[in-house]
Each structure stands twice: as structure tokens, then as C-alpha cells.
Amino acid sequence: MKGLFVTIEGPEGSGKTTLIQGLLPYFEQKEQKVMATREPGGIAISEDIRTILHKQEYTMMEARTEALLYAAARRQHLVEKVMPALNEDYLVLCDRFIDSSLAYQGYARGLGMDKVFEINRFATEDCMPSLTIYLDIEPEVGLARIAKDAGREVNRLDMEDISFHKRVREGYLQVVERFSDRIVLVNADQPMEKLIEEVIQVIEDKLL
């Protein structure tokens, strides 16, 4: 693979999607081949899996089922969209990847990070990001942002209680420590303009 694979991670309301939309024009005007995508989703099969995962009424979904569905969506998205783009020398900006599964299912759901990592090693064939930006934010702040965003559809994970979202952040911080060679922690509780500038600097310093 010749391209650069950058993933953006963070708890609910950390600003991942808005950040990526802010990064795109910067790299486009530099004539960098760049593509934005998301997980779960990005292509038809994975978007269908996303719909299942996010349905509010599916509160009975068991943790292993959830982990396996995310891994399945990840596999299809990787082979159908991400890998071809990397082979065409694109900078791929992806909203979530394997670290989400480690934090949400591995830690917050209690499945164990090592078990979830092995599921995803199988799904990705050890394809890992060139760089991961983790947007750190207190759960209360992130959830308050979501509550104010009238255009954002509330999904099944948003409906979890605050203790779950606190565990997600704890899980992420463990993931950051475990993969410190790949992950850069950035404070997401700042104006989006400043966040975009900081992340651009990180990407350019680390990769370009």
C-alpha cells in the first residue's frame, strides 16, 4: 500500500465527523489525493450493518454479536474502499477503526481488549493505520454536545448511561497507552478551528 491511512477516534460527541470535514479542504487545496470515510459504513454492505448496530430498539443485542458485526463491517469496508484508495496513493481519513472496538466492546462491554483485538486482526489481516488521532473529551461534555445537535440522529450507543460512556473513555486511554507509537491524543474540548489546525500539524509532522 502506497497511501496514508489516518483514523480519527473518540467518544460520542468528540467532534470526529466535523473535524474530518474541516481537514478535507485543506489537503485538497494542497493537491493531496484525499478521501473521507467512516465506520461502520462507507460502502453499502457496511452501511446496512451500521443501521442494525444503531437501531434504538435493538437493546437486546449481545456484546459478542455487537463486536462481530463491527468487525464484519470493518472487513468489507477495508477491502472494498480503504485498500483500493491506499493502493491509489490516497490519504484516507477514516472516522473510527479498530480502536473503537477495543474501547467500546473490549473495555466498556467487558469482552476483553485482547479478545476483541484478535477478532479484528482476523478481519483486517493486520492492516493498521499509519496514524491515529484520538480526540479526548469528558463524557459529560460530549453528550451535552450531542443533546444540542438537532441534526444528529440519536443511536443505540448514545442511549447508554453515563457510566458506560465513562468506561469508553477509560478504555480509549488504555488503548492510547498501548499503541503510543501510533496514536496521538488531542484535547477535543476546544474550538473546532483550533482543533483542525492542531490535527493538521500532527498529520504533517508525522506523515507528510
From Swiss-Prot:
One of its GO terms (biological process) is dTDP biosynthetic process. Transmembrane segments: none annotated. Its EC number is 2.7.4.9. NCBIfam families: DTMP_kinase. CDD domains: TMPK (cd01672). InterPro entries: P-loop_NTPase, Thymidylate_kin-like_dom, Thymidylate_kin_CS, Thymidylate_kinase. This is Thymidylate kinase. The gene is tmk.
